[in-house]
From Swiss-Prot:
Belongs to the radical SAM superfamily. RlmN family. The active site is at E120, C371. It comes from Zymomonas mobilis subsp. mobilis (strain ATCC 31821 / ZM4 / CP4). The lineage of its organism: Bacteria, Pseudomonadati, Pseudomonadota, Alphaproteobacteria, Sphingomonadales. GO terms for biological process: rRNA base methylation; tRNA methylation. Residues 1-20 are annotated as: Disordered. Residues 10-20 have a biased composition (Basic and acidic residues). GO terms for cellular component: cytoplasm. Keywords: 4Fe-4S, Cytoplasm, Disulfide bond, Iron, Iron-sulfur, Metal-binding, Methyltransferase, rRNA processing, S-adenosyl-L-methionine, Transferase, tRNA processing. Reaction proceeds by a ping-pong mechanism involving intermediate methylation of a conserved cysteine residue. One of its GO terms (molecular function) is tRNA (adenine(37)-C2)-methyltransferase activity. Its cofactor is [4Fe-4S] cluster. Gene3D superfamilies: 1.10.150.530, Aldolase class I. This is Dual-specificity RNA methyltransferase RlmN. [4Fe-4S] cluster binds at C140, C144, C147.
Length: 391
């Protein structure tokens, strides 16, 4: 990751525990930094400890409670101080390449990083909630065969600022500043966009802690869901250090099929994965694990598959909800969606066993924003980079 970002960022040495990245223009981007790092950055530019502590508190409030992107409107900071802050610091947002709105109201943004790579995020409005699906990586290493993102190679991890920036940008678009505890349009965040969050653990953890901070965005951990394809060694740590809701991309109940469509199963099998789910901190009947199950015609959608799913969940005594996801096609995809009748029968079998098994309503399909469809121009850039390297 650092080798990719190094072309656009340098590092500023501070008394913080870690170096702080500096932009091409020499300024330090405050978005995504912890309070400790902001204070250290201010001190590195000449402020004493007392002033740095005060300014950190003020900046935090303006960034995460009011959505400020400039210093000149920060009315509780002295006018003489504001130009100095603007000279040395920035409060960024992701660059928007395109924004599309589906006929059903779903919005998809194509975003660009400072070093020129693309990634995507999606906002899904409903009557009682608004869910933002955000990315953790540019590309992915997991190669899930039904997932469009899985056909890309991994370019790099997103930084803390790039992860948090997606939420900030969405709230800009929804006019949700200043932050308010009730009546929000953006009520939920799911880490189900591009990438495997547990393969970018530190940045995802730090970003979500910032999002949950009570003095800023203040989104409850009950409103945040982290999705994994089954990086078993990191799951317990995620529960302990992040503590948000867990979703697992299961998608099959036999080794043969899951090995094919979710190749990480060859490393961490179904039984090992479900045992890790059972041990996830805080799991109980009031806080269930969500299992994602994409419905693929004649692949994983038989009545036998449904009964085996029930058996597995009951064997591991998992408080569970199963989201049945009609497969969303993408160009040259190797699978077809199960028939509505077969999906309904699958749901019925699971539901009759006492396990919630709703069929997810497809959203944003007309703009390639539905589950499994995200795939940005980052892949094309990767191919161009490879061609340059080869030449």
């Amino acid at each position: 990751m650092t080798s990719v970002v190094a072309d656009s960022l340098t590092e500023t040495k501070t008394d913080s525990q870690k170096p702080i990245a500096t932009r091409k223009d020499g300024r330090i981007d405050l978005l995504g930094l912890s309070r400790e790092d902001i204070r250290a950055a201010l001190k590195s530019k000449g402020l004493d400890e007392k002033q740095a502590k005060l300014r950190t508190k003020q900046l935090w409030h303006w960034m995460y409670n009011r959505g400020a992107v400039a210093f000149d409107g920060m009315t509780d900071i002295a006018k003489t101080m504001r130009p100095w802050l603007a000279e040395h610091f920035a409060i960024s947002r992701p660059e928007v390449v395109t924004m599309q709105i589906s006929t059903d109201g779903t919005r998809k943004w194509l975003l660009k990083t400072d070093d020129g790579y693309d990634y995507e995020m999606v906002f899904i409005p409903d009557a009682d909630r608004g869910t933002l699906c955000i990315s953790s990586q540019i590309g992915c290493t997991l190669n899930c065969r039904f997932c469009n993102t899985g056909t890309m190679r991994l370019v790099r991890n997103l930084t803390v600022g790039e992860i948090v920036g997606q939420i900030m940008l969405a709230r800009d678009s929804l006019d949700e500043w200043p932050s308010k505890p009730e009546g929000r349009l953006l009520t939920n965040v799911v880490m189900m966009g591009m990438g495997e969050p547990l393969y970018n653990f530190d940045n995802v953890r730090d970003a979500l802690k910032l999002v949950m901070d009570g003095d800023g965005i203040a989104l409850s951990r009950r409103r945040i869901t982290l999705s994994t394809s089954g990086v078993v060694p990191m799951m317990a740590r995620a529960g302990e250090e992040i503590g948000v809701n867990l979703a697992v991309s299961l998608h099959a109940v036999t080794k043969v099929v899951r090995d094919e469509i979710v190749p990480i199963n060859k490393k961490y099998g179904i039984d090992e994965l479900l045992a890790a789910c059972a041990a996830y901190p805080g799991v109980n009947n009031a806080r269930r694990i969500t299992f994602e199950y994409v419905m693929l015609k004649d692949k994983n959608d038989s009545e036998e598959d449904a009964h085996e799913l029930v058996r597995l969940l009951q064997y591991y005594r998992l408080p569970a909800k199963v989201n049945l996801i009609p497969f969303n096609p993408w160009p040259n995809s190797p699978y077809e969606c199960s028939t509505p009748e077969r999906i309904a029968r699958f749901s019925e079998i699971v539901f009759n066993a006492g396990i919630s098994a709703p069929v997810r309503r497809t959203r944003g399909q007309d703009i390639m924003a539905a589950c499994g469809q995200l795939k940005s121009a980052a892949e094309r850039q990767s191919k161009r980079d490879s061609m340059i390297t080869l030449s």
